[in-house]
Amino acid sequence: MPYFDYASTKPVDERVVEAMLPYMTEHFGNPSSVHSYGFKAREVIEEARGKISELINGGGGDIVFTSGATESNNLALIGYAMRNARKGKHVLVSSIEHMSVINPAKYLQKQGFEVEFIPVDKYGTVDLEFIEEKIREDTILVSVQHANNEIGTIQPIKEISEIINGRAALHVDATASLGQIEVDVEKIGADMLTISSNDIYGPKGVGALWVRQGVRLQPIILGGGQEKGLRSGSENVPAIVGFGKAAEITAKEWGEEAGRLRRLRDRIIDNVLKIEESYLNGHPEKRLPNNVNVRFSYIEGESIVLSLDMAGIQASTGSACSSKTLQPSHVLMACGLKHEEAHGTLLLTLGRYNTDEDVDRLLEVLPGVIERLRSMSPLYRR
């Protein structure tokens, strides 16, 4: 069954599962314990930390393990703002961030911080002039994702870093970009970077926040003081081992894989845009190699997804974290689409196990689905 919902979740690579298994049964020690079982657990955690740091060129900072990207984003925004509030209370956040950034930003507003949301153009690229105009003496934090999980647009993070020029901390959510494009904290100038295990075919329930040396955070989960006091709770050793193995594999394979996915992506886009009144969302060139986000006039994306599912093809209308709401995507609305346009969107995200045959099947089925749904729409007239 062709699966085109890799942005929502990915299967765990079998090599990762194999690496994890001994730490579920045989090597089950608590890394805080002062005996050989604990020492073994601590050793493999630090080994994984090193592999993940190497993947993002993170030698100039520390990897803090969390339960996932959502927690990492909360720690970055709330933890940094609360710790550095004496320096200022002005924060800039891109308007198309994942909700795990948007909602912490709104929480900060309730705590007395002034949060301004950075607008984007029709492709979802942030307005650099807005950042340049709005950054001021009391600005302490700017948060812009590396690439958008819904429309695939890659942001000019290096240019943003140059505009900030050390006047505020720069947080970058790289959850969607890791494993798809190069993620190098030094090249882009990030001070904090959010990443997730499952997005590189590791286990769910573990992520990390990379924190540059000298950046100070207030912990948001209190307890035994694990992870250098920034994230209490006994470390999830098997998951961290899996994260490390996934990072090791990604470091070796992402370039070749990205090229293969880009070829499949372009084939889908070229053929789908031949359908009458279909449009590409996101940047036509500066986009993730696995992302296809298209909209079709006169029909709803949810109907397309359900119809594809009946044909054995899995797809999405947008972020799985927000898919239970009937509201149009805040990302597409920020790009200037109307409600009805945003509701007519289909999101196809490719991954490691997609084949040319999967794409063949999609391109065989999708035009008929669109034609059938439009034939039932009172808005559509040939």
Curated annotation (Swiss-Prot):
Disulfide bonds: none annotated. The keyword Cytoplasm applies. One of its GO terms (biological process) is [2Fe-2S] cluster assembly. Its main location: cytoplasm. GO terms for molecular function: 2 iron, 2 sulfur cluster binding; cysteine desulfurase activity; metal ion binding; pyridoxal phosphate binding. Pyridoxal 5'-phosphate binds at N149. [2Fe-2S] cluster binds at C321. Pathway: Cofactor biosynthesis; iron-sulfur cluster biosynthesis. SUPFAM superfamilies: PLP-dependent transferases. Keywords: 2Fe-2S, Cytoplasm, Iron, Iron-sulfur, Metal-binding, Pyridoxal phosphate, Transferase. It is found in: Cytoplasm. It comes from the Archaea. It catalyses: (sulfur carrier)-H + L-cysteine = (sulfur carrier)-SH + L-alanine. It is an enzyme of class 2 (transferase). Its EC number is 2.8.1.7. Its cofactor is pyridoxal 5'-phosphate. GO terms for cellular component: cytoplasm. The active site is at C321 (cysteine persulfide intermediate). PANTHER family: CYSTEINE DESULFURASE, CYSTEINE DESULFURYLASE FAMILY MEMBER. Belongs to the class-V pyridoxal-phosphate-dependent aminotransferase family. NifS/IscS subfamily. Homodimer. Forms a heterotetramer with IscU, interacts with other sulfur acceptors. NCBIfam families: PRK02948.1. Master enzyme that delivers sulfur to a number of partners involved in Fe-S cluster assembly, tRNA modification or cofactor biosynthesis. Catalyzes the removal of elemental sulfur atoms from cysteine to produce alanine. Functions as a sulfur delivery protein for Fe-S cluster synthesis onto IscU, an Fe-S scaffold assembly protein, as well as other S acceptor proteins. In Archaea the pyridoxal phosphate cofactor is not covalently bound to Lys but ligated by other amino acids. This is Cysteine desulfurase IscS 1. The gene is iscS1.
